[in-house]
Amino acid sequence: GGSAMISRELREAVIGDVILLSLVGIHVVVVHGGGPEISAMLKKLGKESRFVDGLRCTDAETMDVVQQVLCGKVNKNLAATLNRRGGRAIGLCGLDAGLFQARLLDAKYGLVGELARVDPAPVRDCLTAGYIPVVSTVAQGVDGENAYNINADTAAARLAVALGAEK
């Protein structure tokens, strides 16, 4: 999970493995969340993180922070780190090109969504062009109105199925 990436040693090992797999011709897709980073930013802003049933309650203000942290800071830093280490990474957000579409999971969680549709084409295009796609887990609402916070493990599994991944 994402919390494991807090460890510098583990993060460096994972990044090295991703680059090695890519260099030997294995298509690798990195799907990430960023719970600890979101919590840290909310704390800086004086906003308390609240969880129900293990899910972050995501009101509109929190969703703005989630989107900024996941699609901005975490995504771009991870892609940049892969590139610095010799990979060819490109950062994508689930909002890009209709990659992830979601519907409200349950009103008690706020803007937390469940995936309704995954379009693997943007990721497949990056893989075909020789890039390591780095995907953050914010989804466009099927209503076209809201963005939703999506569980990264669920998003990774659904994207893997949509891509026909072997592992």
Residue ranges of model-derived segments:
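Nucleotide/pyrophosphate-binding catalytic subdomain
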Residues: G1-K167
